[in-house]
Curated annotation (Swiss-Prot):
Primary enzyme class: ligase
Binding residue positions for ATP: K605
EC number, UniProt record: 6.1.1.5
Domain notes: IleRS has two distinct active sites: one for aminoacylation and one for editing. The misactivated valine is translocated from the active site to the editing site, which sterically excludes the correctly activated isoleucine. The single editing site contains two valyl binding pockets, one specific for each substrate (Val-AMP or Val-tRNA(Ile)).
Similarity remark: Belongs to the class-I aminoacyl-tRNA synthetase family. IleS type 1 subfamily.
Subcellular location(s) per record: Cytoplasm
UniProt: Zn(2+) binding residues: C899, C902, C919, C922
Primary role: Catalyzes the attachment of isoleucine to tRNA(Ile). As IleRS can inadvertently accommodate and process structurally similar amino acids such as valine, to avoid such errors it has two additional distinct tRNA(Ile)-dependent editing activities. One activity is designated as 'pretransfer' editing and involves the hydrolysis of activated Val-AMP. The other activity is designated 'posttransfer' editing and involves deacylation of mischarged Val-tRNA(Ile).
Name of the protein in its database record: Isoleucine--tRNA ligase
Keyword Heme: no
Protein species of origin: Coxiella burnetii (strain CbuK_Q154) (Coxiella burnetii (strain Q154))
A GO molecular-function annotation: zinc ion binding
Amino acids binding L-isoleucyl-5'-AMP: E561
Amino acid sequence: MTDYKDTLNLPQTDFPMRANLPEREPQTLARWQTLDLYRKIRKDREGQPKFILHDGPPYANGRAHLGTAFNKTLKDIVVKSKTLSGFDAPFVPGWDCHGLPIELNVEKKLGKDKLSANAFRQACRDYAFSQIELQRDDFQRLGVLGDWQHPYLTMDFGYEADTVRALAKIVANGHLLRGQKPVHWCAACGSALAEAEVEYRDKASPAVDVGFEAVDAEAVRQRFGVKNATTRVLVPIWTTTPWTLPANEAVSVHPELHYALVKSELQNQPVYLILAKDLVDSAMQRYGVDDYEVHGNLKGDALEGMQLQHPFLDRIVPIILGEHVTTEAGTGNVHTAPAHGLEDYFVAEKYNLPINNPVDARGRFIPDTFLVGGQPVFKANEPIIVLLADSGHLLHSETIQHSYPHCWRHKTPLIFRATPQWFIGMNKNGLRERALAEIEKVTWLPAWGEARIGKMVADRPDWCISRQRLWGIPIPLFIHKKSGELHPKSPALMEKVAQLIEKESVDAWFDLDPKVLLGDDADHYEKVTDVLDVWFDSGVTHFCVLEKRRELKVPADIYLEGSDQHRGWFQSSLLTSLAIRDKAPYKSVLTYGFVVDSQGRKMSKSLGNVILPADVVKNLGADVLRLWAASMDYTVEVNVSDEILKRASDAYRRIRNTARFLLSNLYDFDPKKDKVAVDQLVALDRWAIFTTQKLQEKIITAYDRYRFPAIYQAIHNFCTVEMGSFYLDIIKDRLYTSKESGLPRRSAQTALYYIAEAFVRWIAPIISFTADEIWQFMPGDREPSVFLTQWFSDFPNAALSGEEEQRWQLLLQIRDEVNKALETYRNEGKIGSALAAEVVLYADERLNAAIATLGEELRFVLITSEASVLPFNEKSKAAFDTALPGLALEINVSEFEKCARCWQRRSSVGQIKEHADLCDRCVSNAFEDGEMRQFA
């Protein structure tokens, strides 16, 4: 048999079938760096409309984990898609560099006491730099394009100085206040914590009912209408923090709740109890009392001012009114310790009660505290409970499990502790109302984010922005020693401090002699040594970065972070921006769910489910990780596992194989010379171009709406359905067997060229390394990188009428039914390949109209050696119905010889003496002018 291989146009390409991403991606990275790609993009997009995605700074501590890898990948997808849309979309990465975790690492390594404060801060700075280098390498290895040589760092002298300037504006605008307020306090940190640094965990706590005895029992009984009695009156409170009882200054009742006087016997003595009417039964059940009488009924406001004896201190405390009292649990009477609770503080403030804080910064009672002096607060619970039991004031005690605030770093329980702190006042100058109004103007993605952050802002307390740490940006203020007032020239003085910090670092403030700035006034003022909450540091990036860097702008078009940032960076950015310039720093905010394993569990070493991005990149490649990120529904928790990543790897392989097919059939195609005009295209090729163009519109819209899973699905379906199992399959015969430069082949190549030009751009934001690798093998003159282009727009006008479009949709369905039938025949051993079959289609009028025009070329669509169409009502006995209404099939095994070149079984094989093993079509294609195709 003659070998006709040289007469075929077999696919050729140097684009490798095996991706080998772990080795090939670093080569692409090196090329990008040699090319200075990021700078080239900036120059290319100069003068175009700006699109700013502002990078929320990750903490400079440890290698990138899967959550931060997911974060940076989504951001990179957005930035690259906007670049392809023609925007100037710079990406300036940043790092959050101050704060406790860095302090703890340095302390562990070097010891805090061995270093001066300045040396300790320098060690923290050095440590942060080392961590930034690690993370920068991780993010670049993921293919994230950005200004990695000029990131913003919250510890840069310039940034620290601008943070002071931001605070100065907030001071000048009247939003800063100082107060002895209770704040979340971590004894291990020795500092106040922000709301965003608090996490809730289950904790076992003692729950006790404690009786406060009425000083004038007779007057109380009379208020309830009980006369001629001598029994004592107790007001029971219920608390899970007995250790706060030494700081008790009042008992709160709700002014509108109804309270009952309950007569009973407790500890073998008659007693009257004042309880919220709705809680009488549950309280008495808790006290183990079945026999009791309810006497009288008063609203809470009638109890105001009643005096009670503290259960173990020589202190008389009043009953006061508080709207925070509920009947969800307890007694309706709330133990009020203004130093240890925000609601307690606010209600006590109305009554001008003292703020008695007996707990020091280490979480221990001060030495002269009765009974528990020097003890850690949680250990003080036991002796207090014993004392209450011995004195007859303990009505009930049990241990309960409940959700309790913990330090995000130490995982230890927090306390509320009143200390002198600096706050941004939520109700000062209408900040809360303006924040809520501004939230409504922002686009929140998903939409439920608006309600979430709105509720948080509506309910949040004043923001405590001061910390008692070494490593941080100072709050450079002077307070008058007698009046406690800020220096009247504070904003101007802060600018002078900012100028010093810009040159010398934050040490300039801590080393500063107040006389340098204040002169003789220095004796009257105290220098503040607190530092700023790190959420303030990162919260003013809109001022220190967006407003300061020439290539950026404020407001940013989008902030994109995890959903936990509704209470973190989104809030701190919003509040500081409003306090500075009275508008939000962002136009839209996109959030995503936490990255968890396939069972919805957080990544944990103890569970053994931790997947490191570095390992994924090393084993599968960054593009597989990026494809996984794009495929996930980020509006909920994001699942990852080895199996899920394997599926992403399989999907990647399909995309790569599609690209390889396109490239391998364009090896001899010069778009300048070989493109076929649209009016000369084979109909199937025109359909393919039209389908590609339509899909591109959907893909660009999905990119614009940040619907990445929809893009992934669209590309996956395009590779597997429209292209893989239909179009590319059909045109193989034409590509390989038609005349090399003939119209049928050049028509198919023209379509493949347009598809490749569009396709490589679609995938570029997601699998960036692979897209740029494909780009190097594309035909024609082009830019050195796909990222220096825009979405492909040079499509010919290949629009189809609605009728034509419908016809091709029906052909897809018909071919699907034929394929299923042929597969059955293959499985039964009746045929080896589809080309061994001859198919008769019995079609109703609707289907007949779709396929009749194809005539002889129908067999190319079905990839059979013969295909004919007959009316549906002429079905033979051998025909069988399909799942498509109006279509029946009859499949016969061809009796003809197989063509040695195209493998089709045709009656013309053996009829041409010079080429007895070829069909007439192959003789024409190989040795004559070549066949013509109109439809397929």
